[in-house]
């Protein structure tokens, strides 16, 4: 992995060196959405630019928790982690704990009241201040709190340590201008701020120059991009411009808002070959009455119409969604409307949430809060329906050849099986068998496989005779370089798999050979942690 240094310079910090003269180590723990994942890359980049080094599995001198504030269990996760870290800190001389992100922006001093052993609290608008705050807290031997109410510097100007050598996130905007009654994000991340197209494309080009072949464009509402500079077609133009970057094979984006999803975006998706046939489109509810109560400025008929137009121009596109069950005032009739829309939409996957009261949102004080047992029963019915649909949609792919970008960190790992994993063009997760005598693909290489089995959350491609078809890529070369730089054992790229069934130790995910296909697995498009994330 590499640090891509953008415009901002993070000075070296004296606090990054311990009393023994060694560089102090850090660990970043991330809760929540894909925005937080990308923010954590910036936090890591800023810390390393200041002189800190990764803990790499050891007990870290600095623990940074990047928080989410969307659901109640996000609070529970934070304070559970902090409770555990209290005892660790007592025996670890000089250890520092920092809490940032949305929950820090919301709770501010409350975090220190509940966990006085925390050293630094910072918000969503000043991530670049972390090294300075750690140094000040260490020097003064007192906690530092710095929460800004508005964005001063666009975070993409910060040094960034990418989690992947072959795929990267690129923020096109931060904040949100919508006023959904269940969502606290606009209050914590502010109004929408758009980056200029030239800055975005320069960052994409820099990623490609580093070896990346896949980029995901990020925003709370990507298709409202351009609102700040008055161009309603700015997002479709951005997709087309990114599509012209040589060497960029896959472009994804998340998340759009149905109310602002226009025909020019659909045309750009269909006419730009490296924009992937995948769409994550949050539904939230299939009831028009509930959508009004949520302040979602579309109705179910419009939503389904968008899906029809997307599929007309991108046949076979995989569409995923978010759905909230048990929103205040939801009746059985409202819920049946949601089931009806889900059946009609034929989502490849859905991230489903039981409504969680978030103080500070209009929905928190609405009448008609649905009893927990009713929410659970409806939630179970929705899950059962979507599992059936996901399986039926995946079964349609059996016998088809799919092109995979070989990945790391996908699915379960088991050193005794020969299955590796990758993402199809439509982002479906595919676990594939490595035939005897085949070239071993590296993360970032492309493999062509034939689907042999289907489950609701993934596909299986067992060997069908003959060697695996692999296309070596610049991204695979970049992965090799990153492995060499980290002093890891050289990969088996270019070699041959042993003829006998044995172990493949590549740091790649695998599945148990005899695992039942009906068992729960990784979501088809895991853009965030569905237990505490948001779109």
From Swiss-Prot:
GO terms under cellular component: cytosol
Gene Ontology molecular function: 4 iron, 4 sulfur cluster binding; metal ion binding; N6-isopentenyladenosine methylthiotransferase activity
HAMAP family: tRNA_metthiotr_MiaB
Keywords assigned by UniProt, alphabetized: 4Fe-4S, Cytoplasm, Iron, Iron-sulfur, Metal-binding, S-adenosyl-L-methionine, Transferase, tRNA processing
The name this protein goes by in its record: tRNA-2-methylthio-N(6)-dimethylallyladenosine synthase
Disulphide connectivity of cysteines: none
Sequence intervals crossing the membrane: none
Assembly and interaction partners: Monomer.
Residue span(s) of domain Radical SAM core: 162-392
Cofactor note: Binds 2 [4Fe-4S] clusters. One cluster is coordinated with 3 cysteines and an exchangeable S-adenosyl-L-methionine.
EC number: 2.8.4.3
Family: Belongs to the methylthiotransferase family. MiaB subfamily.
Annotated organism of origin: Leifsonia xyli subsp. xyli (strain CTCB07)
Job description of the protein: Catalyzes the methylthiolation of N6-(dimethylallyl)adenosine (i(6)A), leading to the formation of 2-methylthio-N6-(dimethylallyl)adenosine (ms(2)i(6)A) at position 37 in tRNAs that read codons beginning with uridine.
NCBIfam families according to UniProt: miaB-methiolase (TIGR01574), MiaB/RimO family radical SAM methylthiotransferase (TIGR00089)
Top-level taxonomic group: Bacteria
Occurrences of domain TRAM (ranges): 395-465
Chain residue ranges for the region called Disordered: 512-535
UniProt KW GTP-binding keyword: no
Binding-site positions, [4Fe-4S] cluster 1: 33, 68, 102
Alphabetical list of InterPro entries matching this protein: Elp3/MiaA/NifB-like_rSAM (IPR006638), Methylthiotransferase (IPR005839), Methylthiotransferase_CS (IPR020612), Methylthiotransferase_N (IPR013848), Methylthiotransferase_N_sf (IPR038135), MiaB_methiolase (IPR006463), rSAM (IPR007197), rSAM_horseshoe (IPR023404)
Catalytic reaction(s) noted: N(6)-dimethylallyladenosine(37) in tRNA + (sulfur carrier)-SH + AH2 + 2 S-adenosyl-L-methionine = 2-methylsulfanyl-N(6)-dimethylallyladenosine(37) in tRNA + (sulfur carrier)-H + 5'-deoxyadenosine + L-methionine + A + S-adenosyl-L-homocysteine + 2 H(+)
């Amino acid at each position: 992995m590499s640090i891509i240094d953008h415009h901002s310079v993070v000075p070296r910090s004296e606090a990054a060196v311990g009393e023994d003269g060694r560089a102090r180590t850090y660990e970043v723990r991330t809760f929540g959405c894909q925005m937080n994942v990308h923010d954590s890359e910036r936090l890591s980049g800023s810390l390393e630019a200041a002189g800190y080094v990764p803990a790499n599995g050891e007990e870290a001198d600095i623990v940074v928790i990047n928080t989410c504030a969307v659901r109640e269990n996000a609070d529970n996760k934070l304070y559970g982690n902090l409770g555990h870290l209290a005892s660790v800190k007592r025996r670890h001389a000089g250890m520092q704990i920092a809490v940032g992100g949305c929950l820090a922006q919301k709770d501010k001093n409350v975090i220190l009241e509940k966990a006085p052993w925390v050293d630094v609290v910072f918000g969503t608008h000043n991530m670049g201040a972390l090294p300075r705050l750690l140094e000040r807290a260490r020097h003064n031997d007192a906690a530092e709190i710095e929460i800004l109410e508005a964005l001063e510097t666009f975070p993409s100007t910060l040094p960034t340590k990418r989690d992947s050598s072959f795929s990267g996130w690129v923020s096109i905007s931060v904040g949100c201008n919508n006023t959904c009654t269940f969502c606290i994000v606009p209050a914590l991340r502010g109004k929408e701020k758009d980056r200029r197209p030239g800055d975005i494309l320069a960052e994409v080009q820099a990623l490609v120059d580093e070896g990346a072949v896949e980029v995901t464009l990020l925003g709370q509402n990507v298709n409202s991009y351009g609102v700040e500079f008055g161009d309603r077609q700015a997002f479709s133009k951005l997709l087309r411009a990114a599509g012209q970057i040589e060497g960029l094979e896959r472009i994804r984006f998340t998340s759009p808002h149905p109310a602002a999803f226009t025909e020019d975006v659909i045309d750009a998706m269909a006419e730009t070959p490296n924009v992937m046939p995948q769409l994550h489109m949050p539904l939230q509810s299939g009831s028009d009455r509930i959508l009004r109560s949520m302040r979602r400025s579309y109705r179910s008929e419009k939503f389904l119409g968008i899906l029809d137009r997307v599929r007309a121009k991108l046949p076979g596109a995989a569409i995923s969604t978010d759905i909230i069950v048990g929103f205040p005032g939801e009746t059985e009739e409202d819920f049946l409307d949601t089931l009806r829309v889900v059946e009609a939409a034929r989502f490849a996957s859905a991230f489903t949430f039981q409504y969680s009261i978030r103080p500070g949102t209009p929905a928190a004080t609405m009448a008609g809060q649905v009893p927990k047992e009713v929410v659970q029963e409806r939630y179970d019915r929705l899950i059962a329906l979507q599992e059936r649909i996901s399986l039926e949609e995946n079964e349609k792919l059996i016998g088809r050849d799919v092109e995979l970008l070989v990945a790391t960190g996908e699915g379960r790992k088991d050193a005794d099986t020969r299955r590796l994993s990758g993402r199809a063009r439509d982002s479906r997760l595919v676990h594939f068998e490595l035939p005897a005598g085949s070239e071993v693909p590296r993360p970032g290489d492309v493999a062509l496989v034939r689907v042999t089995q289907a489950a609701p959350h993934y596909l299986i491609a067992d060997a069908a005779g003959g060697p695996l078809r692999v296309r070596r890529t610049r991204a695979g070369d970049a992965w090799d370089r990153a492995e060499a730089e980290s002093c890891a054992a050289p990969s088996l790229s270019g070699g041959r798999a042993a003829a006998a069934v044995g172990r493949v130790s590549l740091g790649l995910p695998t599945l148990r050979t005899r695992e039942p296909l009906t068992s729960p697995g990784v979501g088809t498009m895991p853009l965030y942690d569905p237990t505490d994330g948001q779109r």
